[in-house]
């Protein structure tokens, strides 16, 4: 029995070293997921506010998952150093839950990436029709038009069918140079053509969102499958320690 323990001790030490390294990398991925989630919310938040509410889950899932991973990454290091079989099993169980959560995040990002065009066309058109220049959705429209240098859905003439145009003309956020735009110019589509951005926001926004949601989904899928390695290491180490009644000092 003693000789068997001596033979398995190097294996356990090797598994312990690998799992500590993995747990540290796991902790780093948690920080990355948290950062990507916050970045997605802050960078894409204005654009997402124009989309249906059920499409806003991916950044929050990443933030929540990233925060939890940071905590359990530290727990994994502690469990490995202690050499506690039940802690290692709990760690492996958590990794399996993280694996499923990240798959959900990745799938939601992938689905959102392919559904965005129809959803954005409908909601952005609705936001233009109800534009008043003051509410949250109106400010979101202004932000999109200013930041992407675009105007309207397909082009600036789309504004002529909105109630806002009758009283105020095209919104100043469409102007190439707002100091060079005046209300009279914005009421006249012919004159406005020389003052406002010509490109519509639809193609620019959908391209921007598809690219960045693809990044979020790709990161989630990549990190999710890395959890399988940690699950295998934690289960193997727990099994070796239990079978050989090995205690780490």
Swiss-Prot record:
Residues 1-16, 76-86, 235-249 are cytoplasmic. It comes from Mus musculus (Mouse). Residues 41-56, 113-213 are extracellular. The chain crosses the membrane at residues 17-40, 57-75, 87-112, 214-234. Keywords: Glycoprotein, Membrane, Transmembrane, Transmembrane helix. Its main location: membrane. Glycans are attached at residues 54, 155, 158, 177, 188. It comes from the Eukaryota. This is Tetraspanin-7. Pfam families: Tetraspanin.
């Amino acid at each position: 029995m003693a000789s068997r323990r001596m033979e398995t001790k190097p294996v356990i030490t090797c598994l312990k070293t690998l799992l500590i390294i993995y747990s540290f990398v796991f902790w780093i991925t948690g920080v990355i997921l948290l950062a990507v989630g916050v970045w997605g919310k802050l960078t894409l938040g204005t654009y997402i506010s124009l989309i249906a509410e059920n499409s806003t889950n991916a950044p929050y899932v990443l933030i929540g998952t990233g925060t939890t991973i940071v905590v359990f990454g530290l727990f994994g290091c502690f469990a490995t150093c202690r050499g506690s079989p039940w802690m290692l099993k709990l760690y492996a169980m958590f990794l399996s839950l993280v694996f499923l959560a990240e798959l959900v995040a990745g799938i939601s990002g992938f689905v959102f990436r392919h559904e965005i065009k129809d959803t954005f066309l409908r909601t952005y058109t609705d936001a233009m029709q109800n534009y008043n220049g003051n509410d949250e959705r109106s400010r979101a429209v202004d932000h999109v038009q200013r930041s992407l240098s675009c105007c309207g859905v397909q082009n600036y003439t789309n504004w002529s069918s909105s109630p806002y145009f009758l009283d105020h003309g095209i919104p100043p956020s469409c102007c190439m140079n707002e100091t060079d735009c005046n209300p009279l110019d914005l009421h006249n589509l012919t004159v406005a053509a020389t003052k406002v951005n010509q490109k519509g926001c639809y193609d620019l926004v959908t391209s921007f969102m598809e690219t960045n949601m693809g990044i979020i989904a790709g990161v989630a899928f990549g990190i999710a499958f890395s959890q399988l390695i940690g699950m295998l290491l934690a289960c193997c180490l727990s099994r070796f320690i239990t079978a050989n009644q090995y205690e780490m000092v």
